[in-house]
Each structure stands twice: as structure tokens, then as C-alpha cells.
Regions:
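Nucleotide-activated sugar donor-binding and catalytic core shared by glycosyltransferases
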Residues: 1-326
Length: 326
């Protein structure tokens, strides 16, 4: 029996889409081993200079001026018109992937990779040869829930919450194609659980922190957008009452600066990590997490019942408003 081939469409706008793509791939291997062949494609940035520029601009303003996203989001919504029934930018590369890989399932985890992409896959491979599915990671509906998510011809539309599904139904997704799946996280987030009685020991032995001091987790997405240094003065003032865990994503400069800062402030207990593969463990030993409204981080925090302090410095992005509202 030939392997089932699954093409996952994602893009590194923020870190949540890639995290869900990787989680889905990990679950496929854990459940089906070598019977399923999964290929992850960062389709936007790999397919076109225009798309790549858009991704880079998205990440740049996320880090420095989140308020600009209100205008940028409105521009991106126009893709729903350009990609009504085919792919406008990056079509040549997408066709190359389709004809070479010939997937049985095209699975999108990104709002800009549904409309047009599903129609083109059916046209090239045959409507009876390929199925198309979407996992939408939004928490709720309204301004910020991109119309690019909504492709009524989808074979299966998976929502994170019932609230988000209700909005998708109103926007045109047929009810018989809808499913609420919940959080799409990597397997280890479900299986690597620290018992409550062992959490203090984890802080001390694995992180070098004090066992019983209030622990604040300053998080960031995979791309490393953060304002840790703006929050440090308030934490240092309370060095006898709290300690901190910092992660920096792929922001090497932020990591280097924090390491240097730590060497000059021995009075404050903190643990610093760059791109972390153990966020699910760090959350379990934290008393509170400070984060923006990114869906992946907030989903993990809710899953592990870690209280969230939302970081609105620089403004709230439209997509983040959906998380805040939920």
C-alpha cells in the first residue's frame, strides 16, 4: 500500500503557524510512523519575492510597531479577492510542489494559504485525488479573523474553539465540514507533565532558581519579538519577592543582551534561554506568564492553567484581539 502523502502549508508570520505545522507532523509520525509521508512547506516566503517581502515586513512591525498591523491587516485582506479561485503570487513554485509531490491531502495552517490553493490543487491533481483541510488557530471571531481563512470548498475545517467555529459558520463554511479540535500542540506538551510536588525541585535543579520564589515567565514567539528590557526594572525592584524565566526565540541579540545584563545584576534570580523546545515545561513551573496575544503561547498557558498577563506594549495586533477577547 503506498504511503499517504500530506502537504502542510505554513508561513513564518509570527511563530504559531509553524508550531502547529510541526505539531501536526509530529502527531502523524507518532500515530502512523512510516505509513504517512509529511512535507512542510513555508509556501509564502519560498514561492515569491512579493510574499517573502510581506512576511519579512510582518515580522519587522510585530517586533517594533505592532500598531501598524491594523493597516497592514486590512491590506492583506485583499488577498481574498486576488486568490478567489487560483494563486496570484508564487503560483509557479506551488505548481512545482504539487506536480512533484502529488499529495493526497493539502493541509493549511495559515490564513493566506487556503483560497486559491485548494482550487489549484484540485485542478492539477484531480478533485477525486486530493483532499483539502484547514486548521484555524484563532480563538474567536470578528475583526482580526481573516477572510482568507474562509474557503467554502474546503473538505474539512478545523477550529480551535466553538466560538471561532461559530464565526466560520457565519462566514460561509458549511456546517457538515466543521470540527472543533482544540489545541494543536506537539505530543510532548501532552505527555511531559511535571507533578505539582516536583515543580519546586525542577526550578532549583534544572533552572538554577529558588524553589519557592514567585516565578514570572517572560515569553516571546519563535521569531523573538519582545520587550523584556522594558519590564526588567519593575522586576528587579522586587528581587526579594520574585524571579524570572526569559525566552528569546530566534532573537540572538536579545539573548546576548540578557546574558550580559544578568552578569551585572547578581541580586536578581533569572533563567535565560534562546529558542526553547521546553516551553511546556517552563510554563508548568511558572506562577504567571507575561506574553502578547499569540495563539500558540496562550493556548499552552491555558492548557497548563498558567495565569496570563497580556503585554500590550506598542499596541495590539488585530489577530491578538481575538485572543484577548476570548
Amino acid at each position: 500500500m503506498p504511503k499517504v502523502r500530506i502537504l502542510i502549508l505554513t508561513s513564518s508570520t509570527g511563530g504559531g503557524h509553524d508550531a502547529r505545522a510541526e505539531a501536526f507532523a509530529d502527531w502523524c509520525f507518532r500515530l502512523y510512523r512510516h505509513d504517512v509521508d509529511v512535507r512542510i512547506e513555508r509556501m509564502l516566503e519560498k514561492s515569491s519575492l512579493v510574499n517573502r517581502a510581506g512576511v519579512n515586513f510582518y515580522n519587522r512591525i510585530q517586533a517594533s510597531a505592532p500598531w501598524v498591523h491594523k493597516a497592514f491587516y486590512a491590506v492583506i485582506e485583499l488577498l481574498s479577492i486576488l486568490n478567489k479561485d487560483t494563486v496570484s503570487f508564487g503560483k509557479r513554485y506551488y505548481l512545482k510542489v504539487l506536480t512533484e509531490y502529488r499529495p493526497h491531502l493539502v493541509f493549511s495552517v495559515h490564513d493566506c494559504l487556503n483560497r486559491g490553493y485548494f482550487q489549484l490543487a484540485r485542478k492539477i491533481l484531480g478533485a477525486d485525488k486530493v483532499r483539502c483541510a484547514t486548521y484555524c488557530g484563532e480563538f474567536s471571531g470578528g475583526w482580526g479573523y481573516s477572510r482568507n481563512w474562509i474557503e467554502p470548498s474546503v473538505d474539512l475545517y478545523i477550529s480551535r474553539t466553538r466560538t471561532a467555529q461559530d464565526f466560520a459558520l457565519k462566514r460561509g463554511i458549511p456546517a457538515e465540514k466543521c470540527l472543533v479540535r482544540g489545541y494543536l500542540m506537539q505530543p510532548q506538551a501532552h505527555f511531559e507533565i511535571i507533578p505539582p510536588k516536583e515543580r519546586e525541585a525542577f526550578r532549583e535543579q534544572r533552572l538554577g532558581l529558588k524553589r519557592d520564589l514567585f516565578t514570572v515567565f517572560l515569553a516571546t514567539g519563535g521569531n523573538g519579538a519582545n520587550n523584556h528590557f522594558e519590564l526588567l526594572p519593575s522586576l528587579v525592584e522586587r528581587a526579594d519577592q520574585c524571579q524570572a524565566i526569559f525566552i528569546c526565540g530566534r532573537n540572538k541579540q536579545a539573548y546576548n543582551d540578557l546574558v550580559h545584563w544578568r552578569s551585572s545584576h547578581p541580586e536578581f534570580n533569572c533563567y535565560i534561554e534562546g529558542y526553547s523546545e521546553t516551553v511546556h515545561l517552563l510554563m508548568q513551573v511558572s506562577d504567571v506568564i507575561v506574553t502578547r496575544g499569540g495563539t500558540a503561547t496562550c493556548a499552552k498557558a491555558l492548557h497548563f492553567k498558567c495565569p496570563i498577563i497580556f503585554n500590550a506594549t506598542g499596541g495590539i495586533m488585530p489577530q491578538e484581539e481575538l485572543t484577548w477577547k476570548y
